[in-house]
């Protein structure tokens, strides 16, 4: 599974290159729709319905033999800086919950973006620690997280502004071919 939360230009270029691959299934999380849910009455009920929609779509990707690529829409919110920071944290926490619910199903995770990756590890997986395995590409680390079933979940921590236009595609190819683990 691949998650792209970063909004920097390089991340968008890398995402677009990845989405050109037919074995990758785009799963777009619309930031405006998420904002409406977090600003409405019945937040928890609507949020759970929204979450279940994404879990179903991601699982359907797996059933089709495709890699789900969960990404936030490339739209900008017109909020003041503190509101924007709080909103993006809520959004990243939501993504972290999705990953947590799928951790035994995904096989590996490529997480693009620092805030997103941090919240997936700390809040979603509640990881007290991970094992650094090394770098998959320059500046891009691979860690493993021990699941309760004694399996290791490889996680690529891919900062938003690091890599080339093809690094996300190249990492995906390496993990799909299982040439590393």
Per-region residue spans from a language model:
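Active-site catalytic microenvironments in core metabolic enzymes, especially phosphate/sugar-handling
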Residues: 1-181
């Amino acid at each position: 599974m691949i998650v792209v939360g970063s909004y920097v230009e390089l991340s968008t270029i890398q995402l677009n290159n990845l989405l050109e691959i037919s074995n990758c299934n785009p799963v777009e999380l619309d930031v405006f729709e998420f904002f409406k849910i977090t600003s409405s009455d019945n937040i928890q009920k609507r949020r759970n319905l929204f979450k279940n929609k994404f879990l179903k779509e991601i699982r359907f990707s797996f059933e089709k033999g495709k890699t789900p690529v969960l990404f936030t829409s490339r739209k900008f919110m017109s909020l003041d800086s503190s509101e924007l920071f709080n909103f993006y944290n809520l959004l990243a926490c939501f993504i972290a919950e999705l990953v947590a619910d799928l951790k035994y199903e995904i096989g590996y995770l490529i997480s693009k973006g620092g805030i997103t990756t941090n919240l997936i590890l700390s809040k979603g997986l509640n990881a007290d620690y991970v094992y650094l395995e090394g770098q998959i590409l320059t500046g891009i680390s691979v860690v493993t997280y021990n699941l309760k079933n004694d399996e290791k979940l490889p996680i690529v921590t891919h900062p938003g502004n690091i890599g080339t236009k093809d690094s996300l595609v190249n990492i995906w190819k390496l993990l799909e071919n299982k040439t590393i683990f």
